[in-house]
Amino acid sequence: KYLFLDEPTNGLDIPSKSQFRSSILKYTSEDSTIVISTHQVRDLENVIDPIIILDRQDVLLNASLEEISHKLFFDYGTELHQESLYSEQLPGGFIQVYPNVRNQDSKVNIEALFNAVHKNKELIKGMFTNK
């Protein structure tokens, strides 16, 4: 069973987005696959797993949230890490992504992940294809 959704939360108000997420979780099963194409990743970041990031016809990343958080660290802080693959200025500091060499736990930020992948295409592909 496959369900393909293109920008499913586009134009929805906040209560409708919440209802959509609940429906996706309710009707997801082991024998079904839901493919969601979206630019509104914050609307769906708690229901997406695995994450596949494409660049035209090239798969840059195809990994579970567990694998991503094992290999990459997502940090919110006031100082930039020297091995940062991606960083973005936020009010009060930075969000940054760097290799998780200390095996620390962090919550995957899908927007930062997307930007880190596109900024470091070959490096990220290498990190995740050499499992």
Residue ranges of predicted features:
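C-terminal coupling/interaction segments
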Residues: 86-131
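Helix N-cap at the start of a conserved alpha-helix in ABC-type nucleotide-binding domains
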Residues: 14-16
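Catalytic Walker B motif of ABC-type/P-loop ATPase nucleotide-binding domains
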Residues: 3-7
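ABC ATPase nucleotide-binding domain "signature" loop
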Residues: 10-12
